[in-house]
């Protein structure tokens, strides 16, 4: 377990964020029973000890995933999640989807990648000033196309291969993303409320997936994990580069010494 994971989140922070409030008892998924502490006034109360355990395991997994050179795709298209998901994914230099999930994003990635490259190509043309050669109407049309494509693909524009993991806010709402990830074998970390099916999720973080403060708290921790993983990878790469440089210098000295001995 990483040092960061050992002091990841306090019970107080979870309570203050409202992470313990589930849905109405009549809207529950019975598979969430192990994660529920009790019910009050017709609302299920989530066991926050299970939340801490789930978040800690998810944190460690994300660290290892990013340290291995993979990206994490943050998914949160519900209104109260969009801003936070975009901010935290960007802070951690990861990918995100905050508009409607486009079918085939994972299962038909070859086609999606063509659209991403098309968008990047358009932006490069604009940056080179090539739009200045067009008529005003045509240039405006291209600008509008870039804006439209960025709204759809902006958060995954740099995705040149499938992500190593998905972090999902509300897998019940993001059912298509869940299905695609399961189909292609990409592990899922998710904020799982009492109306969700935890069996579809690899790393369950049982918590309120509707409250803005709860979403902000958990998403920030996942972003922190991605940053820790990236830092670990960069540190390892630096160590390898130093070792290779040191070995090369030593080999050159040995060759030089042998040459002197022969002379």
Curated annotation (Swiss-Prot):
Keywords carried by this UniProt record: Ribonucleoprotein, Ribosomal protein
Any Gene Ontology CC annotation: cytosolic small ribosomal subunit
Biological process (GO) annotations held by this record are: translation
Return the NCBIfam families for the record. rpsB_bact (TIGR01011)
Against Pfam families, the record matches this protein to: Ribosomal_S2
Q: Which InterPro entries match?
A: Ribosomal_uS2, Ribosomal_uS2_bac/mit/plastid, Ribosomal_uS2_CS, Ribosomal_uS2_flav_dom_sf
User: What's the family?
Assistant: Belongs to the universal ribosomal protein uS2 family.
User: Which gene carries the instructions for this protein?
Assistant: rpsB
Asked if the Swiss-Prot or TrEMBL record annotates the protein with the keyword Ribonucleoprotein, the reply is: yes
- Identification of the protein by name: Small ribosomal subunit protein uS2
Q: What GO MF annotations does this protein's record show?
A: structural constituent of ribosome
């Amino acid at each position: 377990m990483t040092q960061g994971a050992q002091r990841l989140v306090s019970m107080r922070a979870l309570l203050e964020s409202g992470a313990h409030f589930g849905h109405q008892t009549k809207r529950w998924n019975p598979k969430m029973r192990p994660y529920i502490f009790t019910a009050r006034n017709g609302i299920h109360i989530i066991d926050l000890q299970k939340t801490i355990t789930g978040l800690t395991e998810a944190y460690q997994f994300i660290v290892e995933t990013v340290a291995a050179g993979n990206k994490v795709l943050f998914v949160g298209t519900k209104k109260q999640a969009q801003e936070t998901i975009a901010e935290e994914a960007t802070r951690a230099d990861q990918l995100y989807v905050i508009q409607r999930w486009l079918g085939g994003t994972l299962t038909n990635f070859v086609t999606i990648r063509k659209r991403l490259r098309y968008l990047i190509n358009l932006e490069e043309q604009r940056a080179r000033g090539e739009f200045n050669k067009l008529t005003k109407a045509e240039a405006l049309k291209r600008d509008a196309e870039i804006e439209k494509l960025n709204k759809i693909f902006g958060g995954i524009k740099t995705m040149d291969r499938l992500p190593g993991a998905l972090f999902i806010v509300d897998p019940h709402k993001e059912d298509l993303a869940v299905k695609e990830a399961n189909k292609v074998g990409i592990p899922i970390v998710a904020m799982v409320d009492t109306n969700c099916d935890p069996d579809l999720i690899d790393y369950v973080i049982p918590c309120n997936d509707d409250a803005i403060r709860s979403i902000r708290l958990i998403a920030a921790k996942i972003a922190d994990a991605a940053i820790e993983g990236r830092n670990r990878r960069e540190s390892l790469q630096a160590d390898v580069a130093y070792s290779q440089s040191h070995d090369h210098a030593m080999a050159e000295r040995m060759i030089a010494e042998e040459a002197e001995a022969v002379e």
